[in-house]
Amino acid sequence: MSSNTDPNGMKVVVGMSGGVDSSVTALLLKQQGFDVTGLFMKNWEDDDDDEYCSTRQDLVDVASVCDVIGIDLEVVNFSAEYKDRVFADFLREYEAGRTPNPDVLCNSEIKFRCFLDHAMALGADRIATGHYAQVREWANDGRSEYQLLKAEDGTKDQSYFLYRLNQAQLAKTLFPLGALYKRDVRRIAAEAGLHVAEKKDSTGICFIGERPFREFLMRYLPMRPGEIRNLDDGRVIGEHQGLMYHTIGQRKGLHIGGIKGRQDGAGEHDAWYVAGKDVKANVLYAVQGHEHPALLKTRLSATDLHWIAGRDPHTHWVYTAKPRYRTPDMPCEIEALVDGGAEIVFAEPQWALTPGQSVVVYESKVCLGGGVIA
């Protein structure tokens, strides 16, 4: 916690989702002496009566937790902002044949922009969320600078999803769970009598929830069947129902098992994987074998760059990067920074680099920022 976060008289608004992480966040801040208010954000309302929508139960859980902790609860609807700033981009990316990560945009545009602005209007000094990450304030050339650091619990670290935050946002943000492990968070919740102590963590994209992804996407984007071709020789080996349903490295759902990858039958029992898309021709390309060269690349181009410190990192400097969440940090160099883009070269081949996903760059535990894989 930064040196300028003396709890005496400081008002903190906590973004609460109904889960154990945000609940313990509010509890810890209250115990530390902050003036805490809980805030529940409703960011999606197209499916209020849908069997997959948990918003109503989540709000009930938040209200119960706030009652136990003894804090006030505010409810705000950001559904219009979410559709305009996050969901519209999500659909555009899928139409363009890419695989977006809406959680990154949701954080920068909704949770740390709309929510932050709303909290400040309520008179807050800081906001807090249940993200597993850390903020560090340090003096750089006589001025304060804020760094985003990985969480102590490496299995739960969420800095990857927060790489688009800026200095102003980090300066107003607290991450009380950054130094804790998940097991400790659940223990704290149980000891405090919070009924969400063992509540299952939410999974999947926030507005899709647990519903089948294809079923959800079909409501907004029309199916457009086309050919599946073998990338190696161009042969038609199947049919897809829409490029948007497939991502690079995908194995399941191609329905082309048993087809020989090569005319000579070599490797005919290897699984097929998505290796590329031709959006204009509506063709999906597949290759046979997990280690096929088309799935292994040492270089990527990134666009829409954002650097947390507000300045470019060094080129030809050894960093690490995550080309997707849940992958280990991989040694890399930023080879060039040109026209708002970057060329990133990894020390070892990376499997299934996916256009639309984020590549996030680190220097040790410090998240420097990143961009979108082109």
Swiss-Prot record:
Pfam families, per this entry? tRNA_Me_trans, tRNA_Me_trans_C, tRNA_Me_trans_M
Which residues does the annotation list for site: Interaction with tRNA?
Answer: 131, 357
The record's Gene Ontology cellular component field reads:
cytoplasm
Q: Name one GO molecular function term.
A: tRNA binding
Annotated binding of ATP, by residue: 15-22, 41, 130
Reactions performed catalytically: S-sulfanyl-L-cysteinyl-[protein] + uridine(34) in tRNA + AH2 + ATP = 2-thiouridine(34) in tRNA + L-cysteinyl-[protein] + A + AMP + diphosphate + H(+)
Q: Which UniProt keywords apply?
A: ATP-binding, Cytoplasm, Disulfide bond, Nucleotide-binding, RNA-binding, Transferase, tRNA processing, tRNA-binding
The keyword Amino-acid biosynthesis belongs to this UniProt entry's keyword annotation: no
Report the SS bond pairs.
106-206
Q: Where in the cell is it found?
A: Cytoplasm
| Presence of the UniProt keyword Metal-binding in the record | no
Primary site of residence:
cytoplasm
List the EC numbers from the record.
Answer: 2.8.1.13
- Mind telling me what this protein is named? tRNA-specific 2-thiouridylase MnmA
- Organism of derivation: Aromatoleum aromaticum (strain DSM 19018 / LMG 30748 / EbN1) (Azoarcus sp. (strain EbN1))
| Species lineage | Bacteria, Pseudomonadati, Pseudomonadota, Betaproteobacteria, Rhodocyclales
